[in-house]
């Protein structure tokens, strides 16, 4: 890790420690046990792809370190409904506050607004966050290989499995991809954004796709703006896509989502 990602993860560890002090793990686990069952994030994507359509993970994101404020009129329930109306298969909701202006309530309100499975998009550095994610109603969590050691990634994934959560493991280069393949999850995302520099190049997915085994579901992430971009990614085997900023900037999010998937 270096630069942006290191800073984010260092801050996240400090935040998690503060949350642990404010609310012990046992209390969070009680909430997680009383939450509605997880909704089958991977199952929904498989069903969509098997039906001959692209599986879109549509992201609810207010801001980012690279672009600042993305959508001033930010209402997660309305956005969730717009994405669902536009044909999204799943949602991704940013809950990181310091860098993305997210919060837990955004996930709660989006989850309550629609019946789509939801990914908690955050920087997972501690198993405490996994129980927290289940308590919030998340169906899937993110593992960023650039942010974790192999042992930490396994620990986070094992915690997710124990809580019935699916896992999207994210990589940006061949070394991270090889490490990610040691995990159990079939859902493998290639982030076209380098989280250390924030630079974007959609050729990243093209370069790594050939090394993704056939039993993994390839998800192309970041830098996708048009049906042509999705077709370019599909040509190398991606049938699932995580798209946020390009849709969040549109006045009519539902229409933009339909157009992207056309």
Swiss-Prot record:
Keywords: Amino-acid biosynthesis, Aromatic amino acid biosynthesis, Decarboxylase, Lyase, Tryptophan biosynthesis. GO terms for molecular function: indole-3-glycerol-phosphate synthase activity; phosphoribosylanthranilate isomerase activity. It comes from the Bacteria. It is an enzyme of class 4 (lyase). It catalyses: 1-(2-carboxyphenylamino)-1-deoxy-D-ribulose 5-phosphate + H(+) = (1S,2R)-1-C-(indol-3-yl)glycerol 3-phosphate + CO2 + H2O. PROSITE patterns: IGPS (PS00614). Its EC number is 4.1.1.48. Pathway: Amino-acid biosynthesis; L-tryptophan biosynthesis; L-tryptophan from chorismate: step 4/5. The keyword Amino-acid biosynthesis applies. GO terms for biological process: L-tryptophan biosynthetic process. HAMAP family: IGPS_B. Belongs to the TrpC family. Participates in the tryptophan-dependent indole-3-acetic acid production, which is a phytohormone released by A.brasilense. PANTHER family: INDOLE-3-GLYCEROL-PHOSPHATE SYNTHASE, TRYPTOPHAN BIOSYNTHESIS PROTEIN. This is Indole-3-glycerol phosphate synthase. The lineage of its organism: Bacteria, Pseudomonadati, Pseudomonadota, Alphaproteobacteria, Rhodospirillales. The gene is trpC.
